[in-house]
Amino acid sequence: LSVEDGGIGLSAYAMTALIIAMQVGMWFGYVMFGFVSDRVGRKRTYIFYVLMAAALILAYTSTRNPIALLVLGPFVAFFGTGSFSGFGAVTAEIYPTEIRATAQGFTYNIGRLASAAAPWVVGSLAETHGFASALSITSTAFILAAIFWIWIPETRGRELR
């Protein structure tokens, strides 16, 4: 979109470069989460990732500089989507074998159900308050996730039951 319409005013070429850079950051975020969480723990890694995502999204949505967007984009994707790598490991390690598959499916799909509303919510808010304000709500969701994870037990090194 043009700047006048609330967009960032990038050409199709520049937007493609931005998306590719973000996809690369995403991939590294997914991969690195496993290595980092094996070293320092699932809980600390997850909380760090989502708090970094919250901060970076606020920085990302407050700039219109194409170079800054290109530099910040991969880091937003690294932390914002890299945190999802933790769900499989943590849910496998928290639930006993007898209910593991059901519990993983339930928790995963509750998240999918909640996130199904995201395009509508972000679109509606963007229409009334602009894209930056709408996407900033994502920061709030990441902060709430960090708070919620305070009560999730650390599972690094835990034997499956």
Which functions belong to the PLM regions below?
Residues 1-161:
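Transmembrane-helix signature of 12-pass secondary carriers
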